[in-house]
């Protein structure tokens, strides 16, 4: 931790206010990922050991990064998706949140727990409870596992499918991905 604390900021090394370092940012890695999206009939042709879950719903959001913050679109999409399905944070067994930067996920959690912020940005008047940090990225997120540019969504989704398929029946997961600064796709999965 002491060595991480001594790393110089990558984007603002002069002012002393920069916070993004090689220690708290996801590495852009080489990689590829693929997922199958199929009907029940299509799944019947795959081996029984193949992890499988149901895509219940998804929500996309776009924000103005100059007024609402860089990489904050998931905070608009997540509350909308949960509210449409009458769910609270604790109804979700697994949260796979893309962490381009560690601080970005910390900002997401703080904003999601702020009722006023959720009302203003997502247009949702609902209290979701305390965010269950122990259910988020339990096997590591993008900072730990890498950020294969162009394949991050499939990497995170396939990780969520594998983890969710091993959980008790009817468990739910949220997969949240931010992109291009002001975009987000959030999916609700169930096994």
Residue ranges and their predicted role:
Residues 1-45, 113-118, 122-135:
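N-terminal extracellular/periplasmic Venus flytrap/periplasmic-binding protein-like
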Residues 17-33, 58-84, 97-99, 145-155, ...:
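Active-site pocket-shaping loop/turn-to-helix segments
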Residues 36-40, 83, 188-191:
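Short beta-strand-to-turn element immediately C-terminal to the catalytic PLP-Schiff-base lysine
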Residues 42-52, 88-89, 163-173:
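Phosphate-handling active-site elements
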Residues 48-58, 62, 171-183:
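Short, conserved aromatic-histidine micro-motifs
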Residues 56, 64-144:
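Active-site pocket-lining segment
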Residues 84, 127-189:
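Internal helix-turn-beta structural module
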């Amino acid at each position: 931790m002491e060595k991480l604390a001594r790393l110089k900021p990558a984007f603002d090394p002069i002012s002393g206010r920069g916070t993004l370092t090689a220690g708290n940012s996801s590495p852009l890695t080489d990689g590829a990922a693929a997922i199958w999206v199929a009907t029940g009939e299509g799944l019947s042709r795959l081996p029984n050991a193949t992890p499988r879950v149901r895509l219940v719903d998804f929500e996309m959001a776009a924000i103005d990064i100059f007024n609402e913050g860089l990489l904050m679109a998931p905070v608009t999409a997540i509350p909308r998706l949960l509210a449409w399905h009458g769910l609270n944070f604790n109804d979700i067994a697994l949260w796979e949140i893309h962490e381009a930067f560690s601080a970005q996920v910390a900002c997401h959690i703080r904003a999601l727990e702020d009722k006023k912020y959720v009302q203003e940005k997502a247009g949702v008047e609902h209290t979701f409870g305390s965010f269950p940090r122990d259910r988020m990225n339990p096997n590591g997120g993008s900072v730990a596992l890498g950020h294969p540019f162009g394949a991050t969504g499939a990497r995170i989704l396939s990780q969520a499918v594998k983890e969710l398929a091993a959980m008790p029946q009817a468990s739910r997961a949220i997969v949240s991905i931010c992109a291009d600064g002001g975009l987000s796709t959030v999916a609700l999965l169930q096994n």
